[in-house]
Regions:
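Active-site-proximal, substrate-binding regions of enzyme catalytic domains
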Residues: 2-112, 118-172
């Protein structure tokens, strides 16, 4: 069996293609807390808030079917964290949850930790003895301009409706 442990950032990036055959998604209860905070935060990007809500629905749809499990943060894990001398942050708590879960599975099972958070990745390399990966992000190379071909009619339409951003241009 393959177990893929996701931190909050990587889970939000993976929301549209999270479920795989013969793979158990593992997350920490800390991640669930962070998702709740993201959903209700006034200062978060609307796309991130949407991804958090969508992820909550995905988890609800798959509750109890064995496709994911949650490692619950507890006082024993806090003792483990203190022993590592890592700073006490949500990232380090998630890493300690991953380490504890990794110790629960069979040695022949595959365990992969996913994070797109650079600081979390550094701490994971110091703590975990497993592959540490990032979720592939959609790349967009912004070069500062778009070349748009318009005929006379389109040009007239463009200049008569300057408030309409028909070409999805970034506004300076």
């Amino acid at each position: 069996m393959t177990y893929k442990f996701y931190d909050t950032c990587s889970l939000l990036l993976k929301v549209d293609n999270l479920w795989e055959d013969n793979v158990v998604v593992v997350l920490s209860s800390i991640t669930l807390e962070e998702l709740e905070n993201i959903k209700t935060a006034a200062n978060k990007d609307p796309d991130v808030k949407y991804a958090a809500r969508k992820l909550a629905h995905e988890l609800d749809e798959h509750f109890g079917d064995g496709s994911y499990t949650v490692m619950i943060w507890n006082n024993d894990l806090m003792e483990d964290l203190v022993e590592t001398h890592l700073p006490i942050t949500n990232d380090s708590k998630i890493i300690i949850c991953a380490d504890a879960y990794m110790n629960l599975i069979e040695p022949e099972d595959e365990f992969i930790f996913y994070t797109n958070d650079i600081c979390c990745k550094h701490m994971a390399h110091l703590t975990l003895e497993c592959p540490i990966c990032s979720v592939e992000e959609e790349k967009y190379d912004y070069d500062g301009y778009k070349i748009i071909q318009m005929d006379d009619e389109e040009m007239a339409e463009f200049y008569s409706n300057l408030t309409v951003n028909k070409y999805d241009l970034y506004i300076n």
